[in-house]
Design a protein with these regions (language model features):
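Interdomain regulatory linker/hinge segments that flank or connect interaction modules
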Residues: 1-22, 63-111, 156-212, 249-308, ...
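Internal alpha-helical transmembrane segments
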Residues: 1-47, 68, 124-125, 133-134, ...
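Transmembrane helix boundary and interhelical junction motifs in multipass membrane proteins
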Residues: 515-525
Length: 572
C-alpha cells in the first residue's frame, strides 16, 4: 500500500481515541458532572497565596487566559503555568468584594508546582460512608453529644455561621478557649423509609468542644531567618525583610519558636521591640524595629515548605531540626540528647493497643526524614496533633557524624510562663463544595464536550512540554495504580464524573500514542514520513535498532511509574 494509506491506517487508532474522548465528554455533560468551584478554602503558611494575603472565601475569576475557572483548572494552571515569571490570578475578595489581579509564583520544593491553596469546604461535616466527621483522639471526637455525619454548623458561640470562612475565623480567634458549636441535623427515625420528595425534619444540637493542646518533648530549636512575609501585615509595615532574624522580643530572648506566637498574642495591639539581625551581602547589622502584633484572622496550614507561623506579625521563620536547648525535667532531658544534635528523622510508635487500628494514622511503620518531606514546625504543629494516648516518637539523632535512636513520650507544650499552647484545629472534617453542572441542551453538551476534549488534549501536550523544559518533575506522572485510584474517586461522584475522567484518559492515550517513539504509532509515522521524503523505506537494521531502543525506553518508563505508584520511588 502507498505511504498515505499506511499513514491513514496508523492514524486511525489516535483518531478513534479523540472521538471516544469527545463522545464520553458529551455524554458526561448530558448526564451532569460535579465541579469544585475555584474558591480558596485555606492557604499554606509560606506559600505564594499566603504571602499575597489570599483568604478563605476568595473567588478566582480568571487564571491566565482562562475565565470562570474550576478548581481543577487552578491545579493544572499552576502545574503547567509560567514558573519563572509567575501566573496571573484575578481574585474577588470575600472580605469586601473587591476585584484585583495578582501574580503568584508557584513553589516547587515538593516536586510539583504549588501556590499553597486548599479547595473550598461546606459548613457541613463529611457524610461519606465509612468516613467519620471527626478525627480520632481529637477534642471534636471526645465532645458530648457526638458530632454526626452530615451535621451542618449553624452557630459557634454567639456567631451565626454562613460559610466556611466564618468557621475558620472563629476557630482562629478562640484557639485557646472551649467553643460551643450548634449544629443542624436531620432527624432519622428508625424503620422510616427515606423520602427525597419531602423536606427532611431537622433539629439543632449544641456541642461543647475543648481546645487542642500542642505537644512537646522538651526540645527547643533555634528560630531561623524570616522566609515569608504576608502583604499588608504588621511585619511588612515595619519594614521587616526576608532573611532577617529575630534575636529578642522586648529585650528578652526569643526562646522556643513554637511558643513565640502564643506569647505575641498576649501583646495584641501593643507595640513591641524586636532586635533584628539583618544581612546584606557579606555584612551583618543589628537594628531595632517597633511593631504591633495584630489578631490572626484565620487558621494556619503548616506544610514542609512552611516555617513556624508567627501569624500576629504576618511572617514565617525557618526552624531547622537542630537542638538548641533541652528543657529540664522534660522527657528529652532524661535521655541521650544534647544541644547541637541534629534530628534526622522521626517515627511514630503507637501503643500496643492501637498498632492494628486502621483509623490510627500514627501506626505508620516508616521513619519520616526531615527535609523536603517534613519540617520541624509541620511535625510539631500538625503531625503531633490527634495521636493516640501514650504514643511515643522514635528520633534518629545525628551527633559528630554518628547516629543513634532515642524514643520519647510527649507532654503538653507550655510557654516560658507555664501557659498551655493550643492549636486552632479541633479535628472537624468538612465536606468539600461540589456544584452540579448539566448541559441545558444537546447542543450545549456538544459544545462542552468539545471544549473538554480540547482542554484534555492540550493538557497532555503542555505537561509533556513542561517536563521537557524541566519545570515539572518526571515524578509527577502516574501509572496504573494511580489511574485506578483516581477513577475510583471519580466514580464515587457519579457516572458523569467518571466519563470526564475517561475523557482525560483517552486524550492521554491519543497524544502519548502519537509521540515519535518506536513501537508507538508516532514512531511508525516517523518512519513513513522518512519513506515518503526519501522515496524508499529506512533500512531494516535501522528500524530494528530504533525498535529495540523504543522497547527499552517504554519498559523503563513502565517500571518507573509503577515504582512511583507503589511508593518505591519518592515523588518529592
Amino acid at each position: 500500500q502507498s505511504v498515505p494509506k499506511r499513514m491513514a491506517i496508523i492514524s486511525a487508532g489516535v483518531i478513534m481515541n479523540v472521538i471516544f474522548a469527545f463522545v464520553m465528554a458529551t455524554v458526561a455533560y448530558m448526564i451532569g458532572v460535579h465541579e469544585v468551584p475555584c474558591i480558596v478554602g485555606g492557604t499554606v503558611v509560606g506559600g505564594a497565596a499566603w504571602t499575597e494575603g489570599l483568604q478563605p472565601g476568595d473567588k478566582v475569576l480568571r487564571i491566565g487566559t482562562v475565565e470562570n475557572p474550576r478548581f481543577r483548572d487552578l491545579q493544572t494552571g499552576v502545574t503547567l503555568g509560567d514558573l519563572k515569571d509567575g501566573i496571573s490570578f484575578t481574585i474577588r475578595r470575600a472580605k469586601d468584594d473587591r476585584v484585583e489581579t495578582v501574580v503568584l509564583k508557584p513553589d516547587t520544593t515538593l516536586g510539583v508546582p504549588m501556590i499553597g491553596v486548599t479547595g473550598p469546604a461546606e459548613t457541613q461535616l463529611v457524610s461519606d460512608s465509612g468516613t467519620r466527621p471527626t478525627a480520632r483522639w481529637s477534642p471534636a471526637r471526645d465532645a458530648k453529644p457526638e458530632f454526626e455525619p452530615g451535621d451542618t454548623i449553624v452557630k459557634i458561640n454567639d456567631r451565626e455561621i454562613k460559610s466556611y470562612r466564618d468557621i475558620d475565623m472563629v476557630l482562629a480567634r478562640y484557639a485557646d478557649e472551649p467553643i460551643e458549636v450548634t449544629v443542624s441535623r436531620i432527624v432519622r427515625k428508625a424503620g422510616q423509609p427515606r423520602d427525597d420528595t419531602q423536606k427532611p425534619e431537622t433539629t439543632t444540637e449544641a456541642i461543647k468542644v475543648q481546645p487542642t493542646p500542642c505537644r512537646d518533648f522538651g526540645l527547643v530549636m533555634s528560630l531561623g531567618p524570616i522566609n515569608a512575609i504576608q502583604n499588608g501585615s504588621p511585619a511588612q509595615a515595619s519594614q521587616l525583610k526576608i532573611g532577617d532574624r529575630i534575636l529578642s522580643v522586648d529585650g528578652k530572648p526569643v526562646g522556643d519558636p513554637l511558643t513565640l506566637e502564643s506569647r505575641l498574642r498576649k501583646r495584641l495591639g501593643k507595640s513591641i521591640e524586636l532586635a533584628i539581625e539583618h544581612k546584606s551581602g557579606d555584612s551583618t547589622s543589628l537594628k531595632q524595629i517597633t511593631v504591633a502584633p495584630a489578631a490572626p484572622e484565620f487558621t494556619n496550614i503548616v506544610a514542609p515548605i512552611s516555617g513556624v507561623p508567627l501569624s500576629s506579625l504576618g511572617i514565617a521563620c525557618e526552624v531547622r531540626p537542630v537542638v538548641a536547648v533541652v528543657r529540664e525535667n522534660a522527657p528529652a532531658a532524661k535521655l541521650d540528647i544534647q544541644p547541637g544534635d541534629e534530628i534526622v528523622s522521626v517515627k511514630f510508635i503507637p501503643p500496643a493497643s492501637q498498632k492494628d487500628s486502621e483509623e490510627d494514622e500514627s501506626s505508620s511503620s516508616d521513619a519520616i526524614p526531615f527535609g523536603k518531606k517534613l519540617s520541624w514546625p509541620e511535625f510539631m504543629l500538625e503531625g503531633m496533633l490527634f495521636l493516640a494516648p501514650e504514643t511515643n516518637v522514635r528520633f534518629e539523632i545525628k551527633r559528630n557524624g554518628k547516629t543513634h535512636l532515642v524514643e520519647l513520650p510527649s507532654i503538653e507544650l507550655r510557654d516560658e510562663q507555664g501557659n498551655l499552647v493550643y492549636s486552632s484545629h479541633r479535628g472537624l472534617a468538612f465536606a468539600p463544595i461540589h456544584e452540579f453542572h448539566q448541559a441545558a441542551s444537546f447542543s450545549d453538551a456538544v459544545r462542552l464536550g468539545k471544549q473538554e476534549t480540547i482542554d484534555s488534549l492540550l493538557l497532555v501536550y503542555r505537561f509533556l512540554r513542561k517536563i521537557g523544559q524541566g519545570q515539572v518533575p518526571l515524578t509527577g506522572v502516574g501509572g496504573p495504580v494511580e489511574i485506578a485510584r483516581q477513577a475510583g474517586q471519580a466514580a464515587q461522584h457519579g457516572i458523569g464524573d467518571l466519563l470526564v475522567f475517561l475523557t482525560m484518559l483517552s486524550a492521554n492515550l491519543a497524544v502519548l500514542n502519537f509521540l515519535p517513539i518506536p513501537l508507538l504509532d508516532g514512531g511508525h509515522m516517523v518512519f513513513l514520513i522518512y519513506e515518503g521524503v526519501r522515496r524508499k523505506p529506512a533500512s531494516e537494521r535501522v528500524i530494528i535498532a530504533f525498535t529495540y531502543a523504543g522497547l527499552i525506553f517504554l519498559l523503563t518508563l513502565m517500571l518507573f511509574v509503577l515504582g512511583l505508584d507503589l511508593g518505591l520511588i519518592s515523588r518529592r
